[in-house]
């Protein structure tokens, strides 16, 4: 059945750039777009049915490169002061500490988040999941839950098992602390590589894996170098990291070296065409 969506404003592609077609029309048949233009055009096919989208924007799917893929948790985080539950208690560093969400919680969160993304017009997204559920790396179920939800609901997803070398927590006196553990970071990196293998072998054209050392300030030079080595061994697979996001991070860096933060990354080989540095404010 040939269907017309009558705008509204249609975002089209003309002369190598996007353009806005006021009262434009989109004609599709099955999963094929047959025409984008104006209804009076002689090349406009006659539709079997018409969807009235007057007053609305008709656009190709948006690409959300830095998507907080935990809308359920993130809204709670924004609505409440950080002193009310944001800081991790000291038990998170205990052996075999469990995340605040179980596997079913992650699946429900993934369904809600991917559905919300699609509802807002985001058909492709690069996921960033909340730090509230993390210690040194993701819970095992989290990226797989997002992958399953994305495939079932029809979103194109770039996903990763996140990892880092430092875990922040608050001690019993309310003082912020940070504990480093290279072995836990390596475990997280190994799981990230396993997830990339899973994505590559899934047969899905919409599922992509990448490497995500969660924050450069919580990673040693050695971990960042190993990340780049693994990226190169996988054909320069995409790498991203939170970088130079807060003034405290910048001050801690300058206390150690006179190099700028970008110069530091350049000196350890953590720059390249496959790398995306998130924020990069200082």
Each language-model region and where it sits:
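Alpha-helical scaffold segments that flank or form the walls of functional sites
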Residues: 77-156, 188-204
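Metal-coordinating catalytic core of metallo-dependent amide/deamination hydrolases
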Residues: 136-281
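Flexible loop residues that form catalytic
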Residues: 13, 68, 130, 280-281
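Divalent metal-coordination and catalytic microenvironments
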Residues: 8, 26, 31, 55, ...
């Amino acid at each position: 059945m040939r269907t017309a969506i009558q705008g509204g404003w249609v975002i089209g592609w003309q002369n190598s750039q996007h353009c806005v077609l006021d009262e434009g029309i989109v004609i599709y048949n099955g999963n094929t777009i047959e025409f984008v233009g104006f209804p009076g055009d002689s090349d406009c096919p006659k539709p079997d049915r018409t969807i009235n989208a007057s007053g609305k924007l008709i656009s190709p799917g948006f690409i959300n490169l830095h998507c907080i893929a935990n809308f359920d948790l993130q809204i709670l985080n924004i609505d409440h002061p950080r002193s009310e539950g944001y800081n991790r208690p000291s038990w998170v560093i205990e052996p075999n500490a469990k995340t605040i969400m179980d596997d079913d919680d992650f699946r429900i969160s993934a369904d809600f988040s991917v559905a919300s993304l699609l509802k807002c017009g985001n058909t492709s997204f690069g996921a960033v999941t909340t730090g509230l559920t993390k210690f040194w790396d993701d819970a095992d179920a989290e990226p797989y839950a997002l992958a399953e939800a994305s495939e079932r609901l029809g979103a194109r997803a770039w996903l990763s098992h996140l990892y880092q070398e430092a875990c922040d927590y608050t001690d019993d006196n309310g003082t912020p602390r940070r504990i480093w553990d290279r072995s836990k970071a390596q475990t997280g990196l190994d799981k990230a590589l396993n997830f990339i293998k899973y994505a590559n072998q899934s047969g899905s054209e919409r599922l992509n894996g990448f490497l995500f050392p969660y924050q450069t300030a919580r990673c040693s030079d050695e971990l960042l170098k190993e990340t780049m080595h693994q990226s190169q061994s996988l054909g320069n697979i995409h790498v991203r990291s939170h970088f130079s996001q807060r003034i405290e991070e910048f001050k801690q860096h300058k206390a150690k070296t006179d190099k700028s933060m970008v110069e530091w990354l350049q000196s350890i080989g953590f720059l390249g065409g496959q790398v995306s540095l998130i924020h990069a404010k200082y």
